Swiss-Prot record:
Belongs to the MnmG family. Homodimer. Heterotetramer of two MnmE and two MnmG subunits. NAD-binding protein involved in the addition of a carboxymethylaminomethyl (cmnm) group at the wobble position (U34) of certain tRNAs, forming tRNA-cmnm(5)s(2)U34. GO terms for biological process: tRNA methylation; tRNA wobble uridine modification. It comes from Orientia tsutsugamushi (strain Ikeda). Keywords: Cytoplasm, FAD, Flavoprotein, NAD, tRNA processing. NAD(+) binds at residues 268-282. Its cofactor is FAD. It comes from the Bacteria. GO terms for cellular component: cytosol. FAD binds at G10, G11, G12, H13, A14, G15, V122, S176, Q365. The lineage of its organism: Bacteria, Pseudomonadati, Pseudomonadota, Alphaproteobacteria, Rickettsiales. This is tRNA uridine 5-carboxymethylaminomethyl modification enzyme MnmG. Pfam families: GIDA, GIDA_C_1st, SAM_GIDA_C. HAMAP family: MnmG_GidA.
Amino acid sequence: MNKFDVVVVGGGHAGCEAAAAAARIGVKVALITLKPENLGEMPCNPAIGGRGKGHIVKEVDALDGLIGYIADQAGIHYKMLNHTKGPAVWGPRAQIDRALYKSAMYSTIMNYPNLTTIFASVEDIKVIANKVTAVIVNGKEIYCQKVILTTGTFLSGVIHRGKEQIKAGRLGENASYGLSNTLSELGLRLGRLKTGTPPRIDSRTIDYSKLEEQPGDLIPTPFSEITKKVLVPQIKCYITRTNEITHKIIKENLHLSAMYSGQIQGTGPRYCPSIEDKIIRFSHNASHQIFLEPEGLNSNTIYPNGISTSLPSDVQENMIRTIEGLENCKIIAYGYAIEYDYVDPRQLKRSLEVKSVDGLYLAGQINGTTGYEEAAGQGIMAGINAALAVKKQDPFILDRTDAYIGVMIDDLTNGIDEPYRMFTSRSEYRLSIRADNADQRLTPKAIDLGCVSQLRKEVFQKKLSKLNTLRDYVQSLTITPKQLQNCGYQISQNGIARTAFSLLGLPNFGINIVKDIYPELNRYDNNLLLLLTYESKYHAYLERQKEDIVLFKQEETYQIPQDLNYDQIPSLSIEVREKLKQSQPETIRAAKHINGVTPSAIMAIIIFLKTKYLNSSITDKK
């Protein structure tokens, strides 16, 4: 076979999602990756999800993507992060068995309808009159209408460990230099980014008696709506910390770190700093937390999350053995930093197609993101849009009000200057685009596109029907304050009747109390009642948020006084303050387009200015 509608280059998280999504739309797809074992590879931490990231996993699943369902076949330690806060910012996360994940992904991709997998290296892309026509594999052309590049860290990748430099996309795998040259020749602006990984440790050499246990959730919450129950055995993780001796060794050897010797020019991820960065940027901290994460049920390898490093191997040995519980540990593989090319994502349409090259799409780390989840979110969008373009249909665009995927793509196409990672704080609409309602928001859109399986469609429609029926029912149940008092529950004695739906969202009520008042609710699915609880809890806030959105859009053009002291705005993060002070934007619109200045930060500035200049317009303040 040498002719396809869509060719996907790379078999990581972005590539697998892109290929599967395009295939679901019904076009002929080829996924080209170097080796079978590359499919679904997790080269960094053995975990999926988290704050913001977990939302993307749920959204990809809602579009009938792979990452959530595959993760549920390999999840060995589930944890709902931020559970003490509101449901809008809960972050579903799971430790993943690498071998199980890769096996499940391989089986899925190799048996996917409309999808052919080719194990080879793509040497070049053929472009005629600014239009993709083929990819070059082993000197031969494979013709196609659309190409999706999901190259990860392979574009001109260089591994750094101390003074050692190795040309590689990952340890032991060759980098791609031809594609970097091709992209440059096409006139695309490339930049250089960096990420890193910690040393891996033999679990049999760790003294767990000295460590703090970190159990997972008693009842795992699956990522996928298709998953009825997590069947994989669950295990514990452990926590330890660096100490002053650890920091002393690192400081004494900073000149040997590739990051601090000037050897690496690429920008590293702000939110996943190396241990060298941590002890410099946070020198006031006496220690830093390390999560010891198992890489699998049958693996002796531990991933020490929190100490990625580019220090020489001997320094890594000395450093790690100062840490409690790791005094006699054996290092299986040493940590390293990797530097790679990325394409400035401002050159992309929101469909993830390159503006200047018809039919060329980019997804994943090539766009400057970091993380499996961000890659998967871009991959599924690129795959859907490439397939729609083949069918000459309009692109599928998610905006900031639709999904975290929409927030991410909007942020990327407005420009970034450091590896991009998703957080809930990046969304000004996070109360409405929650993890729990991802399917309600996106699965109907996916059904309309024709990119969901019959199983997904049936599962969703059955759930939605039950949810709507239950919502109508709890909204029909009413009770007066006096009747509530007779049941033993106090509420404002204003004579106004409440519905069971409104009671679900009250701080001192919730499911159990409402069930006590209405025992007939015990026959309904508790998970559906939970969804209605979240809806009720945020109902009033969502109404107010509509006003915030109007205010936000109206006040984008307001001018900012040049003497404004950003330190006086307490809700701004240190990062945001630094960027505002550096850029000194003249208007709210200018501030909005500074990378890293979140929509919630913009709202905080507007409210601060409104308060400070309460009796006059802020538009003329200088």
